[in-house]
From Swiss-Prot:
Family statement drawn from the similarity comment of this UniProt entry: Belongs to the RNA polymerase beta chain family.
Protein name: DNA-directed RNA polymerase subunit beta
GO molecular function: DNA binding; DNA-directed RNA polymerase activity; ribonucleoside binding
Key words of the record: Chloroplast, DNA-directed RNA polymerase, Nucleotidyltransferase, Plastid, Transcription, Transferase
One of the Pfam families matching this protein, by short name: RNA_pol_Rpb2_3
HAMAP family cross-referenced by the UniProt entry: RNApol_bact_RpoB
Name of the gene encoding the protein in the UniProt record: rpoB
GO biological process entries: DNA-templated transcription
Complex formation: In plastids the minimal PEP RNA polymerase catalytic core is composed of four subunits: alpha, beta, beta', and beta''. When a (nuclear-encoded) sigma factor is associated with the core the holoenzyme is formed, which can initiate transcription.
PANTHER family: DNA-DIRECTED RNA POLYMERASE I SUBUNIT 2 (PTHR20856)
PROSITE patterns: RNA_POL_BETA (PS01166)
Length: 1088
């Protein structure tokens, strides 16, 4: 629990990522190097008579390590498809008497990927994110368990950071067993006596010694330590001879060797707190006293003292492993492998003797490739290292603040039950109860709440105001950060409660209760404290069902950046904070003078003196700034049409002009998904809730062609095509422009920048060698004379696929070898070519659009604007939604947003509405919206904006006939998003394609060039209509009747009648499966 005195409790959203990696660089590396240093081994082949002469010592100077300057900046790594990394240099001291070695050399341990200031890692030109992992905290846990008959017993388990696990559990007879890993159970008295306790000491330490009687009947209850060790080993390993030395070594390696077992600092604190140990031992390994205390607590639970039981899903028992800790774990794994390599090479004297000199011996000892392979494996294939979601800035910041229960050491999604996926009361203010994926990962992957901060131990903390008991008012001069452990013993009220009430809803010990204001200890900050960033961006959230709010949170992250961004008329106030923390917008850090602005960079001058208030900005001219030595010149490089991981466009748009002054905090440049420094994911458009000729049935959406022609929902997408040459068995492939349709290719055979290309155009010309079909003496003679010129070749140029067109944005070539042909002066090159194609996608039928309240739909038709329904003012609607999609889904918040947007458009102002405004009174949202609708009516003198008989509704006219519709229609300006699920990326057709080898049915999916499959429900529909012949065709010659479909294909070519269908392949598979079950099934033809 920490007291903070600052103006805002809203943290920087990326501090947890950056602070964790900074701790690893400054402290974590040194800790691991100290842990493994020194490495002392013995050379087995030494001829020295004294054993001490055969030792070789390798020590790491942990305090003197340093990093080399990265080869690329983050921007250069993205552009050149490189990795933003730095070499870790560690001074290594090697001492060996018999090798005459005593020297220190700097060793490049590994190339460590570095985190950028925005919390990402750049590998091979692609930004990646390491997701926070939430796991069980190391420590000791007591919990009940039930057998098949429903008998309740108890179990105490030690959970370590790494190493073996130990459990004490009782059976239905009351016997207490010790369980080590997956070995056999042994009576707990045998285990404790093997640790050195006498039976009198064990009994004297227990509150209920009589509860141990069933256990004492199992074995001889008085044993010496050696006898207990022998009995323990004979029980655990019945097939091996038991010795005291082997038993002591086993126990030491399992629980007392710091190299193999550790509770970690957090686990040791938890054990000491749980057992209330007076000694407060700081050993990170297990101690015999820990095991004895665990037995005492287990027996106390068996005798009814259930207050010691732990709730494993409580956040006080779970902690977050951040990026720095996860990388430190991999660094420890790599050093462990390096240690084994050094041991093995020390024992082999021949390796050391082969390499003369001190440096040669050092290089033969230390092979740092093992460290490189560990990091490559972690960043490339670990479940927690993911491609960053760059669809928009909200998706990026949400990805960096994600919490996952999956991954190494975590849960398995296939075995996770409903309890662990559910919402625990301790989540309040720490983990968002709304935002989670739909599907298998529901409840296992979550998002950190908006105000949550993560402390150094990995526990999630939420800020609260301290309630002053004398005045019953919160102390707003500072706030306390409470973890779930400290919050358990306090009485906490939400931030939107009325303190003047006699009974106030509160939380205490994970229970929701009511207390008086005198009994409350802490008060929440604001109503959005328990929500994630994406959820807190939904206005009028309190009027939405939680399931729809979940969809709205997720779909905001899927919104593509539009060609023309626009701020929402109705926001919540967090839009600007999101973009600044993620670096989407460029903000002035101090008062500056802008000297030059273009699409690539912004040049500015900043004062170098300490007190900037002494500068007279009003009377300073440009000449004064340039000539003065009080100002320093700086340059900000802007991102210009850069491809993201999701093929969307990353682009900065300058907001400032040259020769102007800006203040600290001013927004200098916008992102593609921001407007005036605020998050802008969609557009405010005029919609109406009404049915229209069935075109908006269910979740279909009817739109106006204005949205297409005015580029309202037009987005820019950048695709990357990679073409490489390879050395085949027949020869080397190469790039060339000597191919067909080469009008757009340059001298290297690569398409020119700025070219407009369409489907079928050649992007990269390439020639591949072909195997010779003839092997006669003449061909061999020609090859012997002219070399490879006479070989057969074929054109394997890369052509643009169907359905794609656009302009070539950039071309990057990495040529390995170039040769010039003397005859036609063409250049033949080998290597790799990367072609970037930019395309502008307008809204079309099949695209997915959505609001912020989970209201989503597919564009079903694009109407001419003259046919769209229009208002009394003559303005045509832009979109028509189905009104039946509101009541059943219970997301009424979209109606409030729609009507308030109408008032905002009329009054030419934007609204910031925090969720849960009902704290100010009943029906506050309705009254707020009606007030501004009435105000807009008075301002414009248009009575249709607010009618008392039908507030929020208006008479709408049919654009085709000019007649008004029978009922008033709700119209307004909600914020509509265009989602990344575009029809151009999903539509697919095929004439022929691959089939499954087993069922001979078409494969599924666009990526596999799959086809349609007739499922059960489709068959039922055809059966209902009695379409027997159509059904027979679809199940045989059009599906998996191999012989029949080949005959049908030939008959269509020859123009003859279709043949009779045969037996489908899937039916033959069914017969084979039945035969595999020893059910012989034969097929016979019966002629009627």
């Amino acid at each position: 629990m920490t007291l903070f005195r600052q103006n805002s409790a809203l943290p920087n959203f990326l501090d947890s990522q950056r602070d964790s990696f900074r701790y690893f660089l400054e402290t974590g590396i040194r800790e691991e190097l100290d842990f493994f240093s020194p490495i002392v081994g013995q050379s087995l082949g030494s001829s020295s008579k004294r054993p001490t002469d055969r030792f070789i010592s390798v020590s790491f100077h942990s305090k003197d390590f340093y990093f080399k300057k990265p080869h690329y900046t983050p921007q250069e790594a993205v552009q050149k498809l490189g990795t933003y990394k730095s070499s870790l240099i560690v001074p290594v001291h090697v001492y060996s008497k018999y090798l005459n070695l005593n020297a220190t050399f700097p060793v490049a341990f590994c190339d460590l990927p570095l985190m950028t200031e925005h919390g990402t890692f750049i590998l091979n030109g692609s930004p990646r994110v390491i997701v926070h992992q939430i796991v069980r905290c190391p420590g000791v846990y007591l919990k009940p368990q039930f057998d098949k008959q429903g008998n309740r017993t108890h179990l105490v388990s030690f959970l370590s950071a790494y190493g073996s696990w130990l459990r004490f559990e009782t059976d239905k007879k009351g016997v207490v067993f010790a369980h080590i890993d997956n070995l056999r159970k042994v009576p707990v008295t045998v285990f404790l006596q093997a640790l050195g306790f006498s039976m009198d000491t064990i009994v004297g330490a227990l509150k209920y010694p009589e509860a141990l009687d069933p256990t004492l009947k199992e074995v001889d209850w008085k044993l010496t330590t050696d006898e207990a060790i022998l009995l323990l080993m004979s029980r655990l390993f019945p097939n091996r001879p038991a010795t005291v030395l082997r038993g002591r070594k086993f126990l030491f390696n399992q629980f007392f060797n710091p190299r193999r077992y550790s509770l970690s600092d957090v686990g040791r604190k938890r054990v000491n707190q749980k057992f209330r140990m007076r000694s407060k031992t700081k050993h990170l390994t297990l101690t015999p006293q820990d095991a004895l205390a665990a037995l005492d607590y287990l027996l106390r639970c068996e005798n009814g003292e259930t207050e010691f039981l732990d709730d494993i899903d409580h956040l006080k028992n779970r902690r977050a492993r951040l990026a720095g800790e996860l990388i430190q774990t991999q660094f420890r794994l790599g050093l462990n492998r390096l240690e084994r390599v050094i041991y093995n090479r020390i024992s082999d004297e021949n390796i050391l003797r082969k390499t003369p000199g001190a440096l040669g011996s050092l290089n033969s000892l230390i092979r740092t490739q093992v460290l490189a392979s560990v990091f490559q494996e972690f960043f490339g294939s670990n479940q927690l290292s993911q491609f960053m979601d760059q669809t928009n800035p909200l998706a990026e910041i949400t990805h960096k603040r994600r919490l996952s229960s999956l991954g190494p050491g975590g849960l398995n999604r296939d075995r996770a039950g409903l309890i662990v996926r559910g919402i625990h009361p301790s989540y309040y203010g720490r983990i968002c109860p709304i935002e989670t994926p739909e599907g298998k990962n529901a409840g296992l992957v979550g998002s950190i709440a908006t105000f949550t901060q993560i402390n150094k131990n990995g526990f999630l903390e939420s800020p609260y105001y301290k309630l002053i008991s004398e005045s019953n008012t919160p102390d707003r001069n500072g706030f306390f950060l409470l973890s779930a452990f400290y919050e358990e013993d306090t009485v906490v009220a939400q931030g939107d409660v009325d303190l003047s009430n006699f009974r106030i809803p509160t939380r205490n010990k994970s229970q929701f209760t009511e207390n008086t204001v005198q009994e409350i200890n802490f008060l929440g900050l604001c109503p959005i404290q328990f929500m994630s960033i994406a959820t807190s961006l939904i206005p009028f959230l309190e009027h939405d069902d939680a399931n729809r709010a979940l969809m709205g949170s997720n779909m905001q992250r899927q919104a593509v950046s539009l060609l023309r961004s626009e701020r929402p008329f109705v926001g919540t106030g967090l839009e600007a904070h999101v973009t600044r923390d993620i670096g989407a917008t460029i903000v002035a850090k101090q008062n500056s003078y802008i000297s030059y602005v273009d699409a690539q960079r912004i040049d500015y001058f900043t004062p170098v003196i300490g007190d900037t208030n002494l500068i007279d900005y009003q009377n300073l001219t440009a000449e004064d700034v340039f000539a003065s030595n009080q100002f320093k010149h700086n340059t900000i490089w802007l991102t210009s049409y850069q491809r993201s991981n999701q093929d969307t466009c990353l682009n900065h748009k300058p907001l400032v002009e040259a020769n102007t002054w800006v203040e600290a905090g001013d927004c200098l440049a916008d992102n593609a998904a921001t407007a005036k420094g605020e998050l802008a994911l969609g557009r405010n458009i005029l919609i109406g809730y009404m049915p229209w000729e069935g075109y908006n049935f269910e979740d279909a959406v009817l739109v106006s062609e204005r949205l297409v022609y005015d580029d309202v929902f037009t987005s820019i997408h950048i695709s990357r095509y990679e073409v490489s040459t390879a050395r085949l068995r027949e020869g080397q492939e190469y790039f060339t422009n000597q191919v067909d349709r080469n009008q757009y290719l340059d001298e290297f055979g690569v398409v020119k920048i700025g070219t407009w290309v369409e489907a079928g155009d050649v992007l990269v010309g390439k020639i591949s060698p072909q195997p010779d079909s003839d092997n006669d003496p003449e061909s061999r003679l020609l090859r012997a004379i002219f070399g490879g010129v006479a070989r057969n070749t074929k054109t394997t140029s890369y052509c643009l696929s169907s359905g794609v067109s656009g302009r070539i944005l950039d071309v990057r070539c990495e040529f390995k070898r170039q040769t010039k042909n003397i005859e036609d002066e063409s250049i033949e090159s080998t290597g790799s070519v990367y072609v970037y194609l930019v395309e502008k996608r307008r809204l079309q039928v099949g695209d997915k659009v959505a609001g912020r309240h989970g209201n989503k739909g597919i564009v079903s038709n694009i109407l001419p604007r003259v046919d769209m329904p229009y208002l009394q003012s003559g303005k045509a609607l832009d979109m028509v939604l189905n009104p039946l999609g509101v009541p059943s889904r219970m997301n009424v918040g979209q109606i409030f947003e729609c009507l308030l947007g109408l008032a905002a458009n009329t009054l030419k102002q934007n609204f910031k509405v925090l969720p849960f405004d009902e704290m100010h009174g009943a029906e506050v949202s309705r009254g707020f919206v009606y007030h501004y609708l009435y105000k807009s009516r008075l301002l414009t003198q248009q009575k249709w904006l607010f009618k008392p008989n039908s507030p929020g509704k208006s008479i709408v006219f049919d654009g085709r006939t000019g007649l008004n519709f029978d009922q008033p229609v709700t119209v307004g300006y909600p914020y509509i998003l265009k989602l990344v699920h575009l029809v151009d990326d999903k539509i697919h057709a095929r004439s022929t394609g691959p089939y499954s080898l087993v069922t001979q049915q078409p494969l599924g999916g666009r990526s596999k060039k799959g086809g349609q499959r007739l499922g059960e429900m489709e068959v039922w529909a055809l059966e209902g209509f009695g379409a027997a012949y159509v059904l027979q065709e679809l199940l045989t010659i059009k599906s998996d009747d191999m012989i029949g479909r080949n005959r049908a294909f030939m008959s269509m070519i020859r123009g003859t009648l279709l043949p009779k269908s045969g037996i489908p392949e899937s039916f033959k598979v069914l017969v084979s499966e039945l035969r595999g079950l020893c059910l012989d099934m034969s097929i016979a033809r019966i002629n009627f």
